[in-house]
Amino acid sequence: VAGFSLTDEKARKAQKTNSEDLKTENRGCANMELNPLRMDEYPEITSVVDKYYQSLGDKASFVEAYDNIKVYTKLGKYKDTYVAFARYEMKIKDIYTKVPGLGTVYVCKDKDGGYQVSAAVEEEDIKSYINEIAQHEDVQALIEETQTAYHEAVQSDALLQEALMDLKNAYEDSTGS
């Protein structure tokens, strides 16, 4: 009997471990009406995305800073995950006009209860989900607003046009494309 209860206890632990590995899907998250784009709705998400962009600015040699970051979120496919659309103004060194931009990152809760940003998602189901919600009307409107602001900024500043062309050429040279 003692052997049985030990085995039973091990089975319960194994079952508990397996159930923790399962992801709980957010119901209705793919529906725009049930999962609208929200600006600065979750302070902890906004904070971690801000820090992410500040660190990007610190690492990039041509970027002075990412300013005026506004974080728009939609619930991620699974519990405690979010898709964040970060609209920002990038300050390129020695260029007066800031460049409007929009980045997409995946934010998920880590084992310690904090949130972390992932710019490169590996899981195909999550990539597919992000592509799906990026087609929502509210996200498309944000993309269009950002593209319009970008084109206006580029058209207004010849030095910015030149700097962006130099960056594009440097990128293409480094990747061989």
Regions found by a protein language model. Name each.
Residues 1-177:
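Mature, Sec-exported extracytoplasmic domains of Gram-positive
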